[in-house]
Design a protein with these regions (language model features):
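C-terminal catalytic domain of Rieske-type non-heme iron oxygenases
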Residues: 2-176
Length: 176
């Protein structure tokens, strides 16, 4: 994922143990074999966003969908609040939401490669997890992203976004 995780608290836990519940949850979507297919996009694979908010608000916003109808009415038209479900991981590790309405983008007759072991009955599922305290991850049948938050002040945050796709053709090909 091109991210280094550091625990600065005295409650040290091995990262493999920390991430295991999320790995188990997502094993229904992607297995270890599929994880080997993830490729970072070279052209638009990394970018920053400056946000006028406290970083904790950005995490909260990412974890829930109740704000969609009022804050994101256009998004709510294609991904209605009723199509979302809540995800609660182990306390103080991760939480988020899932959707049952993901549609793969298609350009002409081409689309990004999909994870080969993703269950066919779950092709429209996507999940959005906040890995506490400041990492957010999105998992889709055809791409994966990670972004981490850098608090700049009490009301300013920089979001660092990393994009990954399945195979080099999707990540860096000319067609998409």
């Amino acid at each position: 994922m091109d991210i280094v995780f550091i625990n600065i608290n005295s409650n040290e836990i091995d990262f493999d143990d920390y991430i295991k519940p999320l790995e188990q949850r997502w094993s229904k979507f992607i297995n270890k074999e599929d994880q080997e297919l993830i490729v970072h996009s070279n052209d638009h694979g990394y970018f920053n966003l400056s946000v006028d908010c406290n970083w904790k608000f950005a995490i909260e916003n990412y974890c829930e969908s109740y704000h969609l109808p009022t804050i994101h009415p256009e998004l709510n038209k294609v991904s209605n609040i009723n199509d979302h479900y809540h995800i609660q991981g182990l306390p103080n590790r991760f939480a988020g939401q899932g959707s049952k309405k993901y549609e793969q983008p298609i350009k002409g007759n081409k689309k990004f490669n999909s994870f080969p072991n993703w269950e066919k009955c779950m092709l429209k599922n996507s999940e959005y997890i906040a890995l506490f305290p400041n990492v957010m991850i999105g998992l889709h049948v055809d791409h994966f992203y990670v972004f981490w938050l850098e608090p700049l002040s009490v009301n300013k945050t920089k979001e660092h976004m990393q994009m990954y796709y399945i195979g080099n053709d999707s990540a860096n090909g000319e067609d998409l």
